[in-house]
Amino acid sequence: MTPPLIELKDVTRYYGSGDTEVRALDGVSLTIETGEFVAIVGQSGSGKSTLMNLLGCLDRPTNGRYAIRGQNVSELDPDNLAALRRETFGFIFQRYNLLASVSASENVEIPAVYAGLALSERREKAAGLLAKLGLGERVHHKPGQLSGGQQQRVAVARALVNDAEVILADEPTGALDSGSSNDLLNLLEELHASGRTIILITHDQKVAARAKRVIEIRDGKIISDSGNKQAAAEEAPQYRYARKGPSPIAQVAESVKMAFRSLRANLFRTALTLLGVVIGVSAVVAMLAIGEGSRAEVMARFESMGPNLLFVRPGAPGTRMRGGAIATLTLEDAQALGELENILAAVPSRSTNATLRNGGNDYSSSIEGVSETWPIAQNRDMLYGTFFTKDDVDRRIGAVVLGTTTAGNLFDDIESAVGQYVFLGGAPFEVAGILESKGASSWGQDQDDIALVPITTGMMRLFGQSYLSSITLAVDDTDRITETEAAAHAFLLARHGTEDFQIRNTASILASVEETQNSFSILLGSVAAISLLVGGIGVMNIMLVSVSERTREIGVRMATGARRSDIQTQFIVESLVVGGLGGIAGVAIGFGIVFIIAQMGMTVAVTPLPAILAFSSALGTGLVFGLLPARQASRLDPVAALASE
């Protein structure tokens, strides 16, 4: 024997507990066969709407058994309940519950979306149903452009799009005029005649009289039932709750479409939400480009010094030297270090600031006393003239080699400066040559703002001191630089009898500078990341607001067959779309900022990685901060959601 289509046995539905307990349904037993036209009539508060919610699987009984074709509904998980609503029931609501932002056709298509129908099939089916219901020319009209009767016909088409076996009509004439009400009831009779089961919920006895069977409910109990006046269908259709919903790809594609529609519905709010993400992403791109540019520039300048240099400074390790005031390195130390194995050149150095004069031109520059090996160690070439020789150093001659900045401030034509005299410290110095330009140093100091004199001449005429501020050692074989550094350290330690000096190589300085620059980049990135975090909080806030504003829409989607995962996916995808759009705009604006900064002369380094990371972070932000709103949306109670204003 075939089980009845719908069977309720001793069903109760309680709300609240204790003194506040309300019995909306109290011991309801009911059987409805396939093909019946049943009206459930009762006044407000009688329990008829609660009964409809139970029949449509929007709610579960507190006690008792509700079965569809013998399958106990209480044993079904949420996904199978959603499938049951999607495949078996079609809802017609008193307030229509159409989505205001989409067309009549798209409203009709909603259940078909969750049934996994292809877009072309959905549209064809929706258009056909609307045409049969007299709305063929209003397929693309939005609900606000339709009359109440037309909106209710759209709701009927939505109920039929998945070939629903049971039509549940909840006060369908309540918001219609008498003419539209009669048209709707005629339509329900036609659907009944075609073999569908119709369950009509109403408070109006005249409306109920149009049904073949009338059940009256009062205070949660059935008080009368006119009985089944119609034979059940001989061949009952098979129960279809196990049918699967849309494929993941189709689900995501539809969610993306709905996300853009939702964002367009409130452009100003969307723009404000995107702004937070855009600021965060553009800040990440710009700041990392600035940080990387600064790091690359500093590293390039240090590397231009050559990887073969050792720097000897006076003072014990940890001692801070100021102005070369520590007298532990001498010219003899430099000469002795120059004799060590693998030392290509040992350059003694001492410097001061002084004013150079040429006629009416005065210029204050850095004056540095060095040996003839300075160009070798510093990898500097001559632009004009020659560098002074060892003989010049030994004879303490008054010669000077100028950087291009210094020469340009003293002479109108720097090429003609060679052979002329400048006054330095009150004494004349002949310009022996002009160095090739090198630009700024690692610290931003102009390396061409310099004047070089023989170290011996400087000690005698300018410095008034016989000790050095540094010795630079140029190593011949860089593979042995560590070994050479150790040898120089041991040599000076033996020579001085105490460790009153410090030796560092270019590699260690590079490592230290790189660490500092990396820390700077991390700091900049952290500041930008905080901006992105603030943007993410904005995304979560707006999505929570969206869930609150679209509660009824969520209820409609659940009633028409959306699973929890469908709702959750929809809101997560919306968050990802916000994050993605903000990421794209942020990357573009970030590159624009970088371009402007570069035009201002600041060094920047644009690489794909920061942009990819920033965009990925924006997507990740959308995902992370969209999870809570999405979960909240998917956990809404369908009945409460449909009842929300």
From Swiss-Prot:
Its EC number is 7.6.2.-. The chain crosses the membrane at residues 271-291, 520-540, 577-597, 608-628. It is found in: Cell inner membrane. One of its GO terms (biological process) is response to antibiotic. Keywords: Antibiotic resistance, ATP-binding, Cell inner membrane, Cell membrane, Membrane, Nucleotide-binding, Translocase, Transmembrane, Transmembrane helix, Transport. It holds the Pfam family FtsX. It comes from the Bacteria. The keyword Transmembrane applies. InterPro entries: AAA+_ATPase, ABC3_permease_C, ABC_transporter-like_ATP-bd, ABC_transporter-like_CS, MacB-like_ATP-bd, MacB_PCD, Macrolide_Exporter_MacB, P-loop_NTPase. ATP binds at G42, Q43, S44, G45, S46, G47, K48, S49. It is an enzyme of class 7 (translocase). The keyword Cell membrane applies. GO terms for molecular function: ATP binding; ATP hydrolysis activity; transmembrane transporter activity. Residues 6-244 form the ABC transporter domain. Signal peptide: none annotated. It is a multi-pass membrane protein. One of its GO terms (cellular component) is plasma membrane. Non-canonical ABC transporter that contains transmembrane domains (TMD), which form a pore in the inner membrane, and an ATP-binding domain (NBD), which is responsible for energy generation. Confers resistance against macrolides. Homodimer. Belongs to the ABC transporter superfamily. Macrolide exporter (TC 3.A.1.122) family. This is Macrolide export ATP-binding/permease protein MacB. It comes from Hyphomonas neptunium (strain ATCC 15444). The gene is macB.
